[in-house]
Amino acid sequence: MMGLAHLGGVGAKAPALSLAEAGRKLAEPVLDIRNLVVRAGSANLVDGVSLAVRPGETLCLVGESGCGKSLTCMSALGLLDDGLVSSGSVRLFGEETIGAPERALNRLRGRDVTMIFQNPMTALNPIRRVGQQIVEAILQHTDLRGRKAEARMEELLDQVGIPNVPRHKTYYPHQLSGGMCQRVMIAMALACKPKLLIADEPTTALDVTIQAQILRLIRDLQTELDLAVVFVTHDLGVVAEIADHVAVMYSGKVVETGSVDALFDHPSHPYTRALMNSRIGFGRVPGTPLQAIAGTVPSPSARPQGCAFSPRCALASASCTSTPGMVAGRGTMVACHHIGAGVSQ
């Protein structure tokens, strides 16, 4: 992970690996996705995505809306809507989930892997008290019963920073703020001490103060539980704060991936650089204007031939009509025909 101080400049030397970090690199992935394709009819919504996350690591999926980040996560849990078809390989703790029976998936969900969503108000049951909802998760996925389950619920609410637990556990979701509801969702997600937490833009609807508290909470819990975390976001400031590794997605594909330090120091894909140029910080010269990314993400059914970013890219050329493969950049892997070109942009 890197601190927000990194936003003011680039080029810092990466620190030496600690023993814990070196051990993670040798560990088997908790989540291992290879060549994932999600189709709706003839359109590939997710198109050949490969990524992995190991115990104690945070992988951030970054990109604009419609890039396939959330679908990739839903595929990992076998939660695709009817009519969507997936292929490739998604392994959770070494077990293949694509094509797995629902019973096997249910054994993993909630116990070994959990997910928190962008809007906790829609994820929580509006007619059940929040304490009851956490107890239900405990009863479903653990052997705790009665007062022991109740005590575990109270412990979790205290762990995520809910004040006056005896009072707030009796509240309904609408009686709590957005930040408090998100803390309840995190408590529910951690009820069974999972090994993998998937967080789908959990701080987008929160103000910056509450966002910082939630990010700090997730980091602290990750350290305590050795959690692997997949964090979906479009906010590069959040990425700088929590990520170990980053996968930049565009139009259903991963276009650049690598360690957070390598990607922020040496962004090689034009889309990655465009994302950074559209935000304050990230080595920007003071006083220079922000650069909006012209155009929009193409519809999966109307992608241009070759590189999907080429219609929005200042470096586009005739070679971009062929699909670029992943090649080595400056510390990252990049899907681009023009590696090294336009780095000063």
Where are these regions (language model features)?
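A short, proline-enriched helix->beta-strand linker immediately N-terminal to the Walker B motif
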Residues: A191-K195
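P-loop NTP-binding/switch modules centered on Walker-like glycine-rich loops
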Residues: I198, P202, L206-T288
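Short catalytic/signature loops enriched in Gly
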Residues: L4, S18-L19, G23-P29, P163-R167, ...
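Conserved ABC ATPase "signature" region
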Residues: E96, K148-R167, M276-N277
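Conserved ABC transporter NBD signature motif
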Residues: V85-E96
